[in-house]
Amino acid sequence: MSKKAPAKEGKKLPRAATWYEIDMEKGVFRFKNKLCPKCGSVMAFHREPVPRWHCGKCGFTQFQR
């Protein structure tokens, strides 16, 4: 019989909670990452080999200066 894994200590936030910045004073939350200007999907930031924002859906890339 398989045994259950031991319970993890401390409560982890859901993964989606790490995608937003929450300002409790103003009661506002906003998305941390950029949205693609071409298709509206979420863009990922890559540091190597050159810092850039890249959309995995449509392939749009915006290089940092």
From Swiss-Prot:
UniProt protein name: Small ribosomal subunit protein eS31
Cofactor note: Binds 1 zinc ion per subunit.
InterPro entries xrefs: Ribosomal_eS31 (IPR002906), Ribosomal_eS31_arc (IPR022845), Ribosomal_zn-bd (IPR011332)
Keywords carried by this UniProt record: Metal-binding, Ribonucleoprotein, Ribosomal protein, Zinc, Zinc-finger
Example of a GO cellular component annotation carried by this entry: ribonucleoprotein complex
Family matches, as SUPFAM superfamilies: Zn-binding ribosomal proteins
Binding site for Zn(2+): C36, C39, C55, C58
GO biological process, one term: translation
Family under the similarity heading: Belongs to the eukaryotic ribosomal protein eS31 family.
Domain of life: Archaea
GO molecular function, one term: structural constituent of ribosome
Zinc fingers (C4-type), renumbered ranges: 36-58
CC cofactor: Zn(2+)
SMART domains referenced in this protein's UniProt entry, alphabetically: Ribosomal_S27
Pfam families given in the database record: Ribosomal_S27
Subunit comment: Part of the 30S ribosomal subunit.
